[in-house]
Swiss-Prot record:
Originating organism: Xenopus laevis (African clawed frog)
Principal subcellular localisation of the protein: cytoplasm
Motif placement: Clathrin box: 213-217
Protein's name according to its UniProt entry: Low density lipoprotein receptor adapter protein 1-A
Region (AP-2 complex binding) residue spans: 250-277
Tree of life domain: Eukaryota
Amino acid sequence: MDALKSAGRAIIRSPSIAKQSWGGGKHKKLPENWTDTRETLLEGMLFHLKYLGMTLVEQPKGEELSATAVKRIVATAKASGKKLQKVILKVSPRGIILYDSTSNQLIENVSIYRISYCTADKMHDKVFAYIAQSQQNETLECHAFLCTKRKMAQAVTLTVAQAFKVAFEFWQVSRDKTEKREKSGSGGEGASSSQSDGSSSITSLKASASANLLDLEDCTKAFDVLNASDNHIEDLFRQNASNENNNIVWELDDGLDEAFARLAESRTNPQVLDIGLTANDLQSEECLSPSSWDKLELNPAEADELFMF
């Protein structure tokens, strides 16, 4: 945990990145500087959605599993006849935080380490859904949200996957440092080896990150640009940590550590979050630029169609 905290303290928030212009158009292909959103992710990216509901599932991941769950959630939402709750979804390497749009009241806070799957549903293509382990009883829950457009659902999915990747980097650095500290013991030997331990941790992390950047199942080719971020985690440790008031402090308790390790065993690749998007999905559709994700405007016809699922 100490290593994770020190990593967090080394991160200086970058509001200038969050305000960066990505171009005037709203519907653009995934930008070449997609990896720049990592800095924005540290502060949290906001999405304005409508909450459809939740249902329990038996497995932590799977396209067919999530599709069945979403179908059940949508049917229940339709049958209720109630107006969907407008929510703000905040995505960061910490996890997903859900707020009520009207009252700004906190609805739910889900650690990224408890999330096992997310997707843009193919049948209900405006729906984003994720599966996470409950904090109360460790059951698996599928939560679904109605987005303004299909591109929005895809954008949220990609953002959660990217947030997971950044969180995994912190988690692995923390684990590596803890293991090496335990092996080296205390005293002069431990002190003299701390610098080399940190260096080897970074080297090991860079090697795994280079090989597994946002695998997105068979979507690797669509995200080759992410290989440019191999050195990002090393850069984090070079940052000046003097501005304590602006730094993010990370904490990972034993319960979360255990949950993350357990869910990792169920993944196609333990180091990446399984998502229900393929390279064809991304290449056949234009993606929203990051600055436009929460600003998509609808024409009257689209607004009427929004509640038709």
